[in-house]
Amino acid sequence: KVDGLSVALEYRDGVFYQGATRGDGRKGEDVTGNLRTIRSIPMVLPEKLPRLIVRGEVYMARSVFEEINEELELEGKPLLANPRNAAAGSLRQKDPKMCARRRLDIAVFNLQLAEGRTFTTHAETLAYLKAQGFPTISHATLSKGEDILCEIDRLGDTRMDFPFDIDGAVVKLN
């Protein structure tokens, strides 16, 4: 699981319409303007569904975090605490230009709504999201409990190989 800030992205007729943080679970903060500055978020999708909602995690890559902190240190300004807080704070900036300078990224992990489309498995939804241009993270489809535990251990052992911080593993039924 990418360690960042969860957001929902809504598309209407294949065009990015609105984005919000998770907030209290029912109502989040509208951060559409700042989300538009994230280059990895597609603004127009190949398939023009009437309405599509996806969920993803906005994050700051460790390399970007380190570069920004080096710049802040040279300027004598306070350093950012960690990539997760830096991403969350950047996404909540009032000025989209400031957010753009923070070079945030996103990993989309769930399809919430796809009007006019049906899917049988979670793996199918991830393949669809990737085909629509959304960045997704690697995943495995496993059927045995012992294989799942081995994969979780592998993720723990290789966590520093990812360009972003992770705060665990997610196991979903397909």
Region locations from a protein language model:
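RNA/tRNA-interacting regions in translation and RNA-turnover enzymes
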Residues: 1-174
